[in-house]
Amino acid sequence: MVLLGRNPQQLASVAGSLNGGPDAVETLAVAGLSEVPSLIERHRPGVIVNTVGPFTQTGIPLALACLKAGTHYVDLANELDAVLRLLDLNAEAHDRGITIVTGAGFGVLATEALTITLRGEREPALKAQVAALPAVEALGSAVLSSSVDVLAYGGRRYHDGRLVRNRFGADHIRISLPSGGSRQAVGVPTGELEAARRASGAGEVVAYSSEVPSGRIARALLPVMSVVLSVTAIRRQVLRLIEHLRLAPPVSRGEVSWAYARLEWADHSNAEAWLRTGEGYAFTGEVAALVADGLREGSLSAGAFTPGALFGPTLAVRAGAEILLSANKKAMS
């Protein structure tokens, strides 16, 4: 295993925390993203795992380098634009015998696993709602940079099978949890939106997240922030400031992360489910490791996929989650 990054001290710290210790892991410090594609093409590793956002900037260059090198590619992307662009590489990846998996973390897989489970063998749903409600110990500046890109992208939802714009913050939901209480979430253009559309077959799809402030005042400000950040010069300045000051977003602390999905069919029947797991980044690490191991074994289909589409909903269970279905269905754990 080789760890690449810009900070040698952080690389050494991560290497020391892995099984086998630093002696079993090689570290390589690079000046920036621009150096990595040539390294991939030169060394042709079996699998690359990209953990560095914003994935709208890092995903495509690294995935294209992997296609040239014959290397499988995995990332943790959850920005809708990044996920869509990576999935668009499906035909090229298939032709080259390479597998691309985007969204290999709590973001995408948690709600996707629920959607796949709820649909089962049924016909496509009419409507789908999914929500990611993670609890995390800490967030880094790369996460805040990804959040800036999501805000700049603007509101999105699927309507009548088409990806359409809507006002950022217009979609708002309060979700009751099986453990009691509830969580608020706001419609956000994340990779979960596309994964839910594909898994459910629904023409009407909304993806929600609790990681965006959901209070009334915050929802009123979100459209303004989205418009301001859509100006390229302003967004670049904000991203430079985040990197320079190592700013991080506020965290939603706790020991339990939740995800939620609800499908509705044309006959007015519906079903809902929840996914429960621990800290969000710990779950993400398990998912990414399982996906990378699966690709390293070399027995999976070539093409570009979200994790649930390639591995099925049991991937979430293997990573430590429990799926809780509505009363008339059986839980999966």
Label the model's feature ranges:
Residues 55-155, 159, 195, 199:
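Glycine-/Pro-rich loop/turn segments that contact NAD(P) or position catalytic residues
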Residues 7-10:
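Helix N-cap at the beta1-alpha1 junction of Rossmann-like dinucleotide-binding domains, i.e.
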Residues 110-114, 189-192, 283-288:
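Catalytic-loop motifs flanking and including active-site residues across diverse enzymes
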